[in-house]
Amino acid sequence: VTEIIYALGAESQLVAVDTTSNFPSAAADLPSVGYVRALSTEGMLSTDPTLILGEDDMGPPEVLSQLQSLGIELSVIPEVWSGKGILTKVECVSSIVGADRRASDALIGSLQEHLDELSARRSQIDKPIRAALLLALRDGVPTAAGSATSGNGVLEMAGLTNVFADFE
C-alpha cells in the first residue's frame, strides 16, 4: 500500500508506515508503527492519524476496534494475490487517498503492461518449475511463503509452482 501511495504521488498524506513498508527508500524516513500484524493502539495513536489504511492482514483485530472506537477512520483493502488483485488494490488506494486520476490511470496502465509481459513469458514455460520464496527476517531465520501468502501469489503469477504450497 505504501508503494502505491508513493507511486500515485500522494506520499505527503503519510504520517507513518509499518515495518514491512521498505519501498521506496523514502518510506524509511517516516515513523514506524511496528509490524503490520502486531500493531499497538498506543503506537498508532502516537502518530495522530486521521485514517488508517492497510490490507486485511493488519491487526490484531482488537487494536483496530479500539482505534475505530476512538473515531479514527479505518480502510481495509482485501488482498487478492493476482494481477487483477494488484490493479484493484491500486484503484482502491487511489480512491481512498483522492489521488489524481491521471496518476492512477498511468500507474494502472504501466502495471497492466508488466502483467501482460509476464503473461507472455509465463506462456512460454513448457514444464512446471518448482520454486520457493524465502524471506530473511530481522532475526536471521528465513521464513518460507506458504499457500496463503502474497509470496505464493507472486510465484503463481510468474508461472512457478510453490514447493511450500502444502503449508499456509
Please provide the spans of the model-predicted regions:
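Short, glycine/charged-enriched secondary-structure capping and boundary segments
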Residues: 8-12, 29-31, 66-69, 90-91, ...
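Short coil/turn segments
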Residues: 10-11, 19-20, 36, 55-59, ...
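Alpha-helical scaffold segments in soluble metabolic enzymes
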Residues: 4, 92, 153
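Short secondary-structure boundary/capping segments
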Residues: 6-7, 24, 66, 122-123, ...
